[in-house]
Amino acid sequence: MQHRPGIAIVAGLALVAFFGACGGGSDPAQTPAPSALCASSALPSGAADTTIAVAGWPDRDYDLVLPASHACGTPIAVMVVLHGGGSNKEGMRKLTCPEGDLTSARCLYRIAGAAGMAVVFANGTNAPGGQLINANGVRTFDAGGGQNGFICVSGYACTRGVDDIAYVRALLADLATRIDVDPKRVFATGFSNGAAMAQRLACQAADAFAAVAPVSGENQFALAGCDPARPVAVLDIHGTLDACWPYAGGEGGCIDSGLYVSVADTLAGWAARNGCVPAPHATELPPIAGANDGTSVVRLDYDDCDAGGELVHLEVVGNGHFWPRGYAYASGTLVGGVMSLQLDTGQAVVDFFAGHGRP
């Protein structure tokens, strides 16, 4: 495994190529005691490797990244990261790094590590052969949809009806046997299909997640109803020129075609569920020096939300279907707009999560 100073990596066996995101069960008797595994995986050299399989979910292991400074036995915040449709956990790690440089201090997992968070890169369902979105080595999550002409997001996992809520719960249960998870500080972020999956987690797993931060993917699952057990804080990020998941909703898609839920409908839904004043107030964020790409960021804040249910939207004007200040995996001709450099997405996500643990 590549040496990553300051961070310990716990990686699964599957090492598959990044295709551009539009994205065997464990034997409990052989599961290491939490303190032993934590101690072995938190080496400052980052040299400790192990396979973390999810019981009952063969071929869906996950990568765990721990801050090297983490002390075993100390409760730690956890960020679950969900890749886009047509990608995988390795691709998502690259996507969230500037220019795809895994050594950059501005990678999402490195920013989170500096803030003392454990990062989990989850893996969707792998479909054998077929179209690009279902090709071997690229994966999807069942993020909902499929009603009244709205696309079922996304691909093979959706058509198979994979229970990805159960998968994520099983992943968290497994993780809790290995490190001391702080149950009040469990968060989820994702891109595209993974963003829509994060939205679904807020609907159906509000007992487990304190906050979510979807990027370039809206709440398609709400078409079937969304009734969270308690308020979940939401940071929603989306580019106005996204050609894959149009900001205004409607027909879109880089690969799969069909109707997509709009940003406005998603935000209105969360405002109602979280008891917020429905009309937000807008603030244009100051530009980042040297990032002269013609894009800008407008922050929408919703007032008077229920406790634990803060709602914020970052409208990235001119951004296409990209993780802003990440890896430009495709041309704007295909996915719309440009990749904005006016938002440090990783920092925005980590800062939001840091302020939204449950009381």
Question: Predicted segment positions?
Answer:
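Active-site rim elements
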Residues: S154-T159, A248-L259, S331-L341
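The feature captures the conserved acid-bearing segment of alpha/beta-hydrolase catalytic domains
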Residues: A210-A307, G318
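Serine-hydrolase catalytic machinery in alpha/beta-hydrolase-like enzymes
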Residues: A53-D63, G73-F187, R200, Q204, ...
